[in-house]
Amino acid sequence: MSAICWNCRGLGNPCTVKALQRAVLEEDPILVFIIETRLVVSEMEVIKSKLDRQPGLVVPSIRRGGGLALLWRRSTKVDVQTFSPHHIDAIVTEEHNNRTWRFTGFYGDSETNKREESWRLLEELSTRSNLPWLCMGDFNEILHLGEKVGGNLRPEGQMRSFREAVNRCNLRDMGYIGAAFTWSRRLGDRGWVRERLDRALVSSSWVTMFPEVRLHHVAASTSDHCMLVLKAPRARQRKHRRSKMFRFESMWLKDEQCEEVVSEAWEKGKTIGTQNLFTQCMDECRRSLSSWNKNKFGHVGQKISTLQKKL
Protein backbone atom coordinates (compact mmCIF):
# COMPACT_ATOMS: atom_id res chain seq x y z
CA MET A 1 0.00 0.00 0.00
CA SER A 2 1.37 3.40 -0.94
CA ALA A 3 -0.01 6.89 -1.51
CA ILE A 4 1.21 10.42 -2.14
CA CYS A 5 -0.53 13.58 -0.98
CA TRP A 6 0.75 17.07 -1.73
CA ASN A 7 -0.45 20.64 -1.56
CA CYS A 8 1.67 21.63 -4.54
CA ARG A 9 0.55 25.29 -4.63
CA GLY A 10 -0.11 25.10 -8.36
CA LEU A 11 0.97 22.79 -11.17
CA GLY A 12 1.69 25.61 -13.61
CA ASN A 13 5.37 25.51 -12.68
CA PRO A 14 7.29 22.87 -14.73
CA CYS A 15 9.63 22.30 -11.76
CA THR A 16 6.64 21.38 -9.59
CA VAL A 17 5.42 18.89 -12.19
CA LYS A 18 8.90 17.36 -12.42
CA ALA A 19 9.08 17.01 -8.63
CA LEU A 20 5.75 15.18 -8.66
CA GLN A 21 6.82 13.02 -11.60
CA ARG A 22 10.00 12.06 -9.76
CA ALA A 23 8.06 11.07 -6.62
CA VAL A 24 5.51 9.02 -8.57
CA LEU A 25 8.25 7.25 -10.53
CA GLU A 26 10.16 6.42 -7.35
CA GLU A 27 7.25 5.35 -5.14
CA ASP A 28 4.77 4.00 -7.74
CA PRO A 29 1.85 4.86 -5.42
CA ILE A 30 -1.62 3.36 -5.63
CA LEU A 31 -3.11 6.83 -5.10
CA VAL A 32 -1.95 10.38 -5.76
CA PHE A 33 -3.97 13.16 -4.13
CA ILE A 34 -3.03 16.67 -5.28
CA ILE A 35 -4.24 19.83 -3.54
CA GLU A 36 -4.32 23.35 -5.01
CA THR A 37 -3.67 22.27 -8.59
CA ARG A 38 -4.88 25.70 -9.78
CA LEU A 39 -5.78 24.03 -13.07
CA VAL A 40 -8.97 23.31 -15.01
CA VAL A 41 -9.89 19.78 -16.12
CA SER A 42 -8.30 20.00 -19.59
CA GLU A 43 -5.00 21.19 -18.10
CA MET A 44 -5.03 18.38 -15.54
CA GLU A 45 -5.45 15.83 -18.33
CA VAL A 46 -1.97 16.79 -19.54
CA ILE A 47 -0.56 16.34 -16.03
CA LYS A 48 -2.24 12.93 -15.68
CA SER A 49 -0.52 11.80 -18.85
CA LYS A 50 2.87 13.00 -17.60
CA LEU A 51 2.38 11.10 -14.34
CA ASP A 52 1.19 7.95 -16.15
CA ARG A 53 -1.95 8.02 -14.01
CA GLN A 54 -4.79 8.30 -16.53
CA PRO A 55 -7.60 7.12 -14.25
CA GLY A 56 -8.65 9.85 -11.87
CA LEU A 57 -11.10 12.50 -10.76
CA VAL A 58 -10.40 16.21 -11.11
CA VAL A 59 -12.13 18.98 -9.16
CA PRO A 60 -11.25 22.09 -11.20
CA SER A 61 -9.88 25.27 -9.70
CA ILE A 62 -12.05 28.37 -9.38
CA ARG A 63 -10.45 31.49 -10.82
CA ARG A 64 -7.00 29.88 -10.52
CA GLY A 65 -7.57 29.09 -6.87
CA GLY A 66 -7.88 25.66 -5.24
CA GLY A 67 -8.43 22.58 -7.37
CA LEU A 68 -8.11 18.92 -6.34
CA ALA A 69 -7.17 15.73 -8.16
CA LEU A 70 -7.22 12.09 -7.13
CA LEU A 71 -5.29 9.83 -9.52
CA TRP A 72 -4.70 6.09 -9.30
CA ARG A 73 -3.04 3.11 -10.94
CA ARG A 74 -4.86 1.41 -13.78
CA SER A 75 -4.70 -1.88 -11.86
CA THR A 76 -6.52 -0.42 -8.84
CA LYS A 77 -10.30 -0.18 -8.63
CA VAL A 78 -11.39 3.17 -7.23
CA ASP A 79 -15.06 4.12 -6.86
CA VAL A 80 -15.44 7.82 -6.14
CA GLN A 81 -18.38 8.38 -3.79
CA THR A 82 -18.55 12.17 -3.36
CA PHE A 83 -16.42 15.22 -4.03
CA SER A 84 -16.36 18.97 -3.50
CA PRO A 85 -13.77 21.79 -3.62
CA HIS A 86 -12.63 20.49 -0.20
CA HIS A 87 -12.65 16.70 -0.50
CA ILE A 88 -12.67 13.59 -2.67
CA ASP A 89 -14.08 10.46 -1.04
CA ALA A 90 -13.53 7.04 -2.61
CA ILE A 91 -13.62 3.29 -2.00
CA VAL A 92 -10.40 1.53 -2.99
CA THR A 93 -10.08 -2.15 -3.94
CA GLU A 94 -6.55 -3.45 -4.45
CA GLU A 95 -6.35 -5.86 -7.36
CA HIS A 96 -3.61 -8.19 -6.07
CA ASN A 97 -5.26 -8.99 -2.72
CA ASN A 98 -8.86 -7.71 -3.02
CA ARG A 99 -8.54 -5.63 0.14
CA THR A 100 -11.18 -2.90 0.23
CA TRP A 101 -10.84 0.30 2.22
CA ARG A 102 -11.80 3.94 2.12
CA PHE A 103 -9.72 6.96 1.16
CA THR A 104 -10.70 10.58 1.67
CA GLY A 105 -8.49 13.35 0.35
CA PHE A 106 -9.24 16.41 2.48
CA TYR A 107 -8.56 20.14 2.14
CA GLY A 108 -9.55 22.24 5.15
CA ASP A 109 -10.79 25.74 4.42
CA SER A 110 -7.97 28.28 4.49
CA GLU A 111 -10.28 30.92 6.01
CA THR A 112 -10.42 30.59 9.79
CA ASN A 113 -14.07 31.68 10.01
CA LYS A 114 -15.02 28.80 7.68
CA ARG A 115 -13.00 26.11 9.48
CA GLU A 116 -16.07 24.84 11.37
CA GLU A 117 -17.65 24.06 7.99
CA SER A 118 -14.66 21.84 7.24
CA TRP A 119 -15.14 19.91 10.50
CA ARG A 120 -18.84 19.48 9.79
CA LEU A 121 -17.93 18.04 6.39
CA LEU A 122 -15.44 15.67 8.02
CA GLU A 123 -18.03 14.49 10.54
CA GLU A 124 -20.65 14.02 7.83
CA LEU A 125 -18.21 11.91 5.83
CA SER A 126 -17.53 9.74 8.88
CA THR A 127 -21.16 8.54 8.90
CA ARG A 128 -21.16 7.24 5.34
CA SER A 129 -19.14 4.03 5.65
CA ASN A 130 -17.74 1.54 8.15
CA LEU A 131 -14.83 0.51 5.92
CA PRO A 132 -11.24 0.93 7.18
CA TRP A 133 -10.63 4.65 6.64
CA LEU A 134 -7.64 6.76 5.66
CA CYS A 135 -8.24 10.52 5.57
CA MET A 136 -5.24 12.40 4.24
CA GLY A 137 -4.62 15.99 3.25
CA ASP A 138 -3.97 19.60 4.22
CA PHE A 139 -6.33 20.35 7.11
CA ASN A 140 -5.12 23.94 7.48
CA GLU A 141 -5.15 23.45 11.26
CA ILE A 142 -3.02 22.06 14.07
CA LEU A 143 -4.08 19.78 16.92
CA HIS A 144 -2.00 21.47 19.64
CA LEU A 145 0.60 24.22 20.12
CA GLY A 146 3.47 21.74 19.80
CA GLU A 147 2.69 21.59 16.08
CA LYS A 148 3.67 25.22 15.51
CA VAL A 149 6.70 27.48 15.99
CA GLY A 150 6.88 31.20 15.21
CA GLY A 151 4.13 33.67 14.44
CA ASN A 152 1.10 34.40 16.62
CA LEU A 153 -0.24 31.89 19.12
CA ARG A 154 -3.10 29.78 17.82
CA PRO A 155 -6.34 30.21 19.85
CA GLU A 156 -7.00 27.14 22.00
CA GLY A 157 -10.64 26.99 20.92
CA GLN A 158 -9.63 26.72 17.28
CA MET A 159 -7.38 23.72 17.95
CA ARG A 160 -9.92 22.13 20.28
CA SER A 161 -12.59 22.20 17.56
CA PHE A 162 -10.27 20.23 15.29
CA ARG A 163 -9.40 17.70 18.03
CA GLU A 164 -13.05 17.17 18.89
CA ALA A 165 -13.98 16.64 15.23
CA VAL A 166 -11.22 14.04 14.86
CA ASN A 167 -12.40 12.25 18.01
CA ARG A 168 -16.06 12.26 16.93
CA CYS A 169 -15.01 10.68 13.63
CA ASN A 170 -13.19 7.90 15.55
CA LEU A 171 -9.96 8.80 13.78
CA ARG A 172 -6.44 9.24 15.10
CA ASP A 173 -3.31 10.90 13.82
CA MET A 174 -0.95 8.20 12.53
CA GLY A 175 2.26 10.12 13.25
CA TYR A 176 5.12 10.65 10.82
CA ILE A 177 8.77 10.15 9.93
CA GLY A 178 10.80 13.21 8.97
CA ALA A 179 10.60 16.94 9.69
CA ALA A 180 8.24 18.03 12.47
CA PHE A 181 6.42 20.61 10.34
CA THR A 182 4.85 20.35 6.90
CA TRP A 183 4.37 24.04 6.06
CA SER A 184 6.60 27.07 6.46
CA ARG A 185 6.59 30.74 5.54
CA ARG A 186 8.95 33.63 6.15
CA LEU A 187 7.44 36.56 8.04
CA GLY A 188 9.88 39.24 6.93
CA ASP A 189 12.06 40.46 9.80
CA ARG A 190 10.07 38.37 12.28
CA GLY A 191 11.63 35.12 11.08
CA TRP A 192 9.77 31.98 10.07
CA VAL A 193 6.48 30.38 11.03
CA ARG A 194 6.26 26.58 10.72
CA GLU A 195 3.21 24.39 11.27
CA ARG A 196 2.10 20.81 10.82
CA LEU A 197 -0.96 21.41 8.65
CA ASP A 198 -0.75 18.24 6.53
CA ARG A 199 -1.38 14.81 8.03
CA ALA A 200 -2.98 11.39 7.74
CA LEU A 201 -5.87 10.43 10.02
CA VAL A 202 -6.78 6.76 10.26
CA SER A 203 -9.38 4.49 11.82
CA SER A 204 -8.32 1.60 14.06
CA SER A 205 -9.48 -0.91 11.45
CA TRP A 206 -7.28 0.74 8.79
CA VAL A 207 -4.24 0.44 11.08
CA THR A 208 -5.08 -3.23 11.62
CA MET A 209 -5.26 -3.75 7.86
CA PHE A 210 -1.96 -1.91 7.21
CA PRO A 211 0.12 -2.21 10.41
CA GLU A 212 3.43 -1.74 8.60
CA VAL A 213 2.58 1.48 6.74
CA ARG A 214 4.25 4.73 7.84
CA LEU A 215 3.83 8.38 6.82
CA HIS A 216 6.91 10.26 5.61
CA HIS A 217 7.31 14.05 5.36
CA VAL A 218 9.34 14.78 2.22
CA ALA A 219 10.68 18.31 1.65
CA ALA A 220 9.75 19.88 -1.69
CA SER A 221 11.53 23.04 -2.85
CA THR A 222 8.74 24.08 -5.24
CA SER A 223 6.02 24.38 -2.57
CA ASP A 224 5.79 25.70 0.98
CA HIS A 225 4.19 22.35 1.91
CA CYS A 226 5.98 19.04 2.39
CA MET A 227 4.91 16.10 0.30
CA LEU A 228 3.26 13.30 2.30
CA VAL A 229 4.37 9.82 1.25
CA LEU A 230 2.60 6.84 2.78
CA LYS A 231 4.39 3.52 2.35
CA ALA A 232 5.51 0.28 3.95
CA PRO A 233 9.20 -0.05 4.96
CA ARG A 234 9.65 -3.06 2.68
CA ALA A 235 7.94 -1.49 -0.35
CA ARG A 236 11.24 -0.58 -2.03
CA GLN A 237 12.60 -4.12 -1.60
CA ARG A 238 9.52 -5.65 -3.19
CA LYS A 239 9.77 -3.55 -6.30
CA HIS A 240 11.14 -5.31 -9.35
CA ARG A 241 14.18 -3.56 -10.74
CA ARG A 242 13.57 -2.27 -14.24
CA SER A 243 16.05 -1.10 -16.79
CA LYS A 244 16.62 2.58 -16.20
CA MET A 245 15.27 4.78 -18.97
CA PHE A 246 17.89 6.99 -20.61
CA ARG A 247 17.10 10.69 -20.34
CA PHE A 248 19.07 13.43 -22.05
CA GLU A 249 19.66 16.23 -19.55
CA SER A 250 19.49 19.78 -20.90
CA MET A 251 22.25 20.84 -18.48
CA TRP A 252 24.73 18.72 -20.47
CA LEU A 253 24.50 21.19 -23.36
CA LYS A 254 26.07 23.86 -21.16
CA ASP A 255 29.27 21.81 -20.91
CA GLU A 256 31.70 22.03 -23.84
CA GLN A 257 32.67 18.36 -23.46
CA CYS A 258 29.17 17.19 -24.33
CA GLU A 259 29.57 17.79 -28.07
CA GLU A 260 32.90 15.97 -28.04
CA VAL A 261 31.44 12.96 -26.20
CA VAL A 262 28.55 12.68 -28.69
CA SER A 263 30.82 13.09 -31.72
CA GLU A 264 33.26 10.39 -30.58
CA ALA A 265 30.44 8.02 -29.64
CA TRP A 266 28.72 8.50 -33.00
CA GLU A 267 31.91 7.69 -34.90
CA LYS A 268 32.48 4.64 -32.73
CA GLY A 269 28.92 3.48 -33.39
CA LYS A 270 29.62 3.42 -37.12
CA THR A 271 32.36 0.83 -36.69
CA ILE A 272 30.86 -1.73 -34.30
CA GLY A 273 28.10 -4.32 -34.30
CA THR A 274 25.83 -5.59 -37.01
CA GLN A 275 22.63 -3.72 -36.10
CA ASN A 276 20.99 -0.92 -37.94
CA LEU A 277 23.61 1.84 -38.26
CA PHE A 278 21.44 4.53 -36.67
CA THR A 279 20.55 2.26 -33.73
CA GLN A 280 24.23 1.39 -33.18
CA CYS A 281 25.20 5.06 -33.06
CA MET A 282 22.34 5.99 -30.73
CA ASP A 283 23.16 3.12 -28.35
CA GLU A 284 26.80 4.15 -28.23
CA CYS A 285 25.83 7.79 -27.55
CA ARG A 286 23.56 6.67 -24.73
CA ARG A 287 26.30 4.58 -23.10
CA SER A 288 28.96 7.25 -23.50
CA LEU A 289 26.77 10.08 -22.19
CA SER A 290 25.65 8.00 -19.20
CA SER A 291 29.25 7.18 -18.31
CA TRP A 292 30.39 10.78 -18.85
CA ASN A 293 27.52 12.13 -16.75
CA LYS A 294 28.37 9.79 -13.87
CA ASN A 295 32.03 10.81 -13.88
CA LYS A 296 31.41 14.51 -14.53
CA PHE A 297 28.35 15.30 -12.42
CA GLY A 298 27.84 12.25 -10.20
CA HIS A 299 24.40 10.92 -9.25
CA VAL A 300 22.35 14.13 -9.54
CA GLY A 301 19.08 12.48 -8.47
CA GLN A 302 20.71 11.05 -5.35
CA LYS A 303 22.21 14.45 -4.51
CA ILE A 304 18.78 16.09 -4.84
CA SER A 305 17.24 13.44 -2.58
CA THR A 306 19.97 13.93 0.05
CA LEU A 307 19.50 17.71 0.02
CA GLN A 308 15.71 17.33 0.33
CA LYS A 309 16.16 15.16 3.44
CA LYS A 310 18.48 17.78 4.95
CA LEU A 311 15.83 20.44 4.31
What are the language-model segments listed below?
Residues 1-311:
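A shared catalytic/ligand-binding motif for oxyanion handling
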